[in-house]
Amino acid sequence: MKKQLLVTAIGLAIVLGACSNKANNAGTVGESTTVATENTTVDNTDTTETSIALSKAKIHLKYSNLADNETRGRVKKALANAGLSEDKINKFFEAVDEYNNAVGSKNLVQEMTSIEAAFPTFDQDKLIDAWLNNNQGFVGRNCRITSYSLMGDFIKVGNKTPGDTTMLFNDFAAIDAKKIFEGEDKEKFDTIFSYIDVNNTHDTNELADEIVKSWNDKQISFDNDKMHMISVFMTMDDGKNAVQEFIGHTGVLVNDKDKYLFIEKLAFELPYQVDEFDNLQDVNDYLMGYYDNDAEGLTAKPIIFEDNHVMKEYRVLK
């Protein structure tokens, strides 16, 4: 708890607006985010919450913190096969090394690791201390910054008119500190990840329609069939202002032969993580298993988007 307060002092809106760390008492790590649209307008945003729901207890994970050469090689090759430029790949790994060197490899898994649990556990206090002691005042990179760094070349934004970006101030501080995005890229980032005003409803079909309409109005489109932005849309409702949908977490999904690799940054001060999945259903279940944590049903269920549409595999877990 002490470290969470310290992180909040660095950036107050980590929980509400940025890829943020949400840890239970065991140290499980999580995050938050925003996304965009594809080449074709999507009218059918059916978010059927299937009754054939998987128990969260049955999810298992295989992951790496990109500290090992084998996984790094797999990711580099997969990104190159998806059409990402060598320069962008190199910059991504420079960012990974910046974080990993700061926190120390001993605090990260050393290879692609299988665990009999849905989510990894970290010594969160130790990671945060190490990052804060070695980051030279830089807040770090989060899920949105990481996803756009990888996907930006494959996203078009025809109408660069961002909505509410108030809660993205930590993102902006990080971007400004290292000039991560400038000019058109910064305008695209702001437009894609701005919050979307929606009706006050728990109907995920209606919310998905509103998200898609907002993206269509902004003329946001994706153009890569080998690499996709996966986003977890969440609801923000403070009871005073307009209800909004925002991307509480995002990552990039890339093909790797008969597997899928999901590349994510858990939070500004928490690790990069690459997860290996056999199919897209497992991707949805991993994300819903972590981010659908409103047991009292105070807000709508999270909605998982693949690029500009609800994932076909979207379902709510038990």
Regions of interest found by a model, annotated:
Residues 1-4:
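Positively charged n-region of N-terminal signal peptides that target proteins for export
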Residues 7-13:
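Sec-dependent N-terminal signal peptides
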